[in-house]
């Protein structure tokens, strides 16, 4: 529970995430339930006030969470402190986390120092979160050996299999004294997942670290999830083995599949390799930050914009600006000064714990929630759970609560435009590859053979005296900032586009008068969709 699950439930599934954890706990009352908590970010993409953090942790514990794995995307321990203390206060298991990555500044000494700070905060255990599978076996042995020497609390490891090293890394970490390790049942393991449970049990069989788990009892579990997995085949990424590019790009498995899906939805999957190559450059510009939510989305979205727009940083997302300003905390290394100047100008950079600048907010959020559901006539209970949904996801949360009993609401159909260029894709169906080309005349060829395909665009080409500004990437219109007929200065924000869970400002290219606005909040758009018209 936690992590991206909460967001996915309310954004895509129309499912109450609180009800999910309650059901799981009721089915497994004797098994401790664990969640992934992004420190001061909770399950959202910005920092929340300390009282909101306290309320969320308390509510999660009441609803069935026992173990709280707390991490910070920048590995800034100040951003984990309040969440860890909140877990301790409700008598949960507080597991502090280091989000493993590699860079010139990330050394064994740095990790050990961070781990000691986490222990000093009162954490009951420490997790090594290797979200991209970058931890090499012998480095893992050295790291765990040092941590066992320096710490008194148990050490847990979470290592993805994307690079193919997870099994060896797990074995070497266990040899060094690792206490616990995450695995996946075999039918849901490897590639974007983890080391197979059965594999590690077999490796340790007959050793002094034998698990005692009966392999035969795992067989029906593996068979069950083998059937379940087939239902979700269309959502899986294209990776079938090992992707060694991750050793350079450091893209975690979850980020890989998200990028693939986003680029497919924007008819730009052919630019995937360019985006992968851009990611480490953006990451370095932002101070060698680890790629884990929300920084993975921040870096990923900016990389997509840099590639699709054809000009690096011609558009800088609000989240990148916030990171450059220090609103997410201290970066591992200094950020690119030129980018910082371009992004935030002369604005002062925050050096304190970012949440110290936030006033207690829960009571005001509660009042706003009650007023909003009354104004919009939303039949949602003003429960702590619903208020917390609203606190973390104001727009998405309200839409969820308003439409929770309307399943069709959670299926969005993108807008189309008349001008369509040739697009080629390599599609794999049942391990058989097909070359599919969508041509500008709306015809389709599969392996060179013509097919019939009708396309009915729902947005007509804009006609007018002004310049038409098009969407630089696909996403949903989050907010319009101006009205038709309004005068704007150059570089004024006209629209806010939400893409890959990040907000991107669409600005006026010059001073002028806004003509027709072709979209409204909630609309889905693709790259090239007309957004608005501006006349000088």
Where on the chain are the PLM-derived regions?
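Active-site beta->alpha loop and helix N-cap motifs at the rims of alpha/beta catalytic domains
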Residues: 2-114, 119, 126, 133-137
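Structured functional modules or segments
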Residues: 459-536
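Glycine-rich phosphate-binding active-site loops on the catalytic face of alpha/beta enzymes
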Residues: 70, 130, 176-193
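Conserved, mostly hydrophobic/aromatic
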Residues: 70, 126, 177, 200, ...
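Core active-site phosphate/anionic-ligand binding loop and the adjoining beta-turn-alpha structural block
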Residues: 168, 193, 197, 201, ...
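Terminal or standalone catalytic/regulatory effector modules within metabolic enzymes
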Residues: 1-9, 240-243, 254-452
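Catalytic cores of alpha/beta
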Residues: 109-114, 163-178
């Amino acid at each position: 529970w936690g992590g991206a699950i909460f967001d996915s439930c309310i954004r895509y599934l129309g499912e109450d995430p609180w009800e999910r954890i309650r059901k799981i706990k009721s089915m497994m009352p004797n098994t401790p339930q664990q969640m992934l908590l992004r420190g001061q970010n909770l399950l959202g993409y910005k920092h929340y006030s300390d009282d909101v953090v306290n309320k969320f942790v308390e509510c999660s514990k009441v609803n069935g969470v026992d173990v709280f794995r707390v991490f910070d995307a920048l590995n800034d321990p100040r951003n984990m402190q309040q969440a860890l203390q909140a877990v301790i206060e409700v008598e949960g298991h507080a597991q502090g986390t280091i989000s493993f990555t590699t860079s010139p500044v990330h050394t064994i000494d740095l990790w050990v120092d961070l781990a000691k700070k986490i222990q000093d905060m009162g954490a009951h255990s420490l997790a090594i979160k290797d979200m991209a599978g970058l931890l090499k076996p012998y480095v893992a042995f050295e790291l765990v050996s040092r941590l066992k020497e320096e710490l008194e609390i148990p050490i847990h490891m979470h290592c993805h299999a994307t690079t193919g090293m997870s099994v060896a890394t797990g074995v070497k970490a266990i040899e060094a004294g690792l206490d616990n390790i995450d695995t996946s049942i075999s039918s849901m393991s490897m590639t974007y997942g983890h080391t197979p449970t059965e594999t590690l049990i077999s490796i340790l069989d007959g050793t002094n670290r034998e698990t005692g788990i009966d392999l035969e009892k795992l067989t029906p579990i593996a068979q069950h999830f083998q059937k379940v997995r087939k239902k979700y085949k269309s959502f899986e990424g294209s990776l079938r083995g090992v992707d060694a590019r991750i050793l350079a790009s450091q893209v975690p498995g979850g980020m890989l599949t998200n990028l693939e899906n986003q680029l497919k939805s924007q008819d730009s999957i052919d630019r995937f390799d360019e985006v992968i190559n851009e990611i480490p450059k953006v990451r370095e510009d932002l101070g060698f930050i680890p790629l884990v939510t929300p920084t993975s989305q921040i870096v990923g979205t900016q990389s997509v914009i840099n590639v699709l727009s054809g000009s690096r940083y011609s558009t800088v997302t609000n989240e990148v600006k916030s990171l450059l300003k220090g609103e997410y905390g201290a970066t591992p290394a200094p950020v690119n000064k030129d980018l910082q100047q371009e992004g935030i100008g002369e604005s002062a950079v925050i050096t304190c714990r970012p949440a110290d600048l936030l006033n207690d907010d829960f009571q005001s959020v509660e009042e706003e929630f009650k007023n909003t559901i009354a104004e919009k006539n939303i039949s949602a209970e003003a429960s702590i759970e619903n208020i917390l949904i609203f606190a973390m996801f104001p727009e998405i949360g309200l839409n969820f609560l308003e439409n929770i009993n309307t399943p069709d609401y959670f299926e969005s159909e993108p807008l189309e435009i008349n001008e369509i260029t040739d697009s080629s894709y390599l599609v794999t169906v049942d391990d058989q590859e097909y070359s599919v080309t969508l041509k500008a005349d709306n015809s389709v060829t599969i392996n060179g053979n013509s097919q019939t395909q009708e396309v009915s665009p729902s947005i007509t080409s804009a006609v007018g005296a002004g310049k038409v500004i098009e969407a630089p990437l696909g996403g949903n219109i989050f907010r319009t900032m101006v009205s038709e007929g309004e005068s704007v200065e150059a570089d004024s924000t006209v629209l806010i586009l939400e893409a890959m869970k990040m907000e991107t400002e669409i600005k006026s290219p010059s001073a002028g008068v806004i003509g027709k606005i072709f979209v409204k909040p909630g609309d889905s758009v693709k790259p090239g969709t007309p957004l608005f018209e501006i006349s000088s």
